[in-house]
């Protein structure tokens, strides 16, 4: 019963992590305008993402434009685009594998050992996906903070951490926890299987011991008669 609850929790966290990974990938709020010094008065608000940048001026709705070329991105955003696309695919594969490894799923048969190994694989992929999400998010955040405190960079070009980065950190944590739960399910199944197989052997040993203990008694009586 405990392993079933862990499976449900792991699948839920994995699904949330998968949706969060896709959301972080498509969100344009990776870098947002920093309102400091002469830029305190809000005339323009800039968002920079992996696929587009958006500008909102005073009394004008936000306008977004897709990047004309990959080279228009900074190196950290270029790497982030590739890693986040890979993470989206990996999270989807891990989620589908987790569904196949659930005990309530019948399409993979009733072999619990096979399902346990499928869940273990899904858990490992979830953990790796969480690390893949964590790398570009932390990389971009480090670049933003470094430029923010760099006196050479113009104030108008300085940016702050966007909502996508905070969501990325949360998503990475959720994916890692979900994968860890699936690994715990595998460990619990292995322990229960080893315990289940050790009990009959112990009983058989006791039975053979009692049989061997009675046989000399029978033999001595027949010899006496």
UniProtKB/Swiss-Prot annotation:
Reaction(s) catalysed by this chain's protein: chloride(in) = chloride(out); bromide(in) = bromide(out); iodide(out) = iodide(in); fluoride(in) = fluoride(out)
Tissue expression: Expressed in the epididymis, mainly in the caput segment.
Function comment: Can associate with other claudins to regulate tight junction structural and functional strand dynamics. May coassemble with CLDN4 into tight junction strands containing anion-selective channels that convey paracellular chloride permeability in renal collecting ducts. Cannot form tight junction strands on its own.
A Pfam family annotated for this UniProt entry: PMP22_Claudin
Assigned GO CC terms: apicolateral plasma membrane; basolateral plasma membrane; bicellular tight junction; endoplasmic reticulum; plasma membrane
Compartment list: Cell junction, Tight junction; Cell membrane
Transmembrane residue ranges: 8-28, 82-102, 118-138, 167-187
Subunit field text: Can form heteropolymeric strands with other claudins. Directly interacts with TJP1/ZO-1, TJP2/ZO-2 and TJP3/ZO-3. Interacts with CLDN4; forms coassem. Interacts with KLHL3.
Keyword terms, alphabetized: Cell junction, Cell membrane, Membrane, Tight junction, Transmembrane, Transmembrane helix, Ubl conjugation
InterPro entries, sorted: Claudin (IPR006187), Claudin_CS (IPR017974), PMP22/EMP/MP20/Claudin (IPR004031)
Cytoplasmic topology ranges: 1-7, 103-117, 188-225
Biological process (GO), any one: calcium-independent cell-cell adhesion via plasma membrane cell-adhesion molecules
Major localization class: other
Family recorded in the similarity comment: Belongs to the claudin family.
Protein name per UniProt: Claudin-8
A GO MF label: structural molecule activity
Bilayer topology: Multi-pass membrane protein
Chain positions covered by the region annotation Disordered: 206-225
Reported modifications of this chain: Ubiquitinated by the BCR(KLHL3) E3 ubiquitin ligase complex in the kidney, leading to its degradation.
Region annotation Interactions with TJP1, TJP2 and TJP3: where it falls in the sequence: 224-225
Organism for this UniProt entry: Homo sapiens
Side Extracellular, residues: 29-81, 139-166
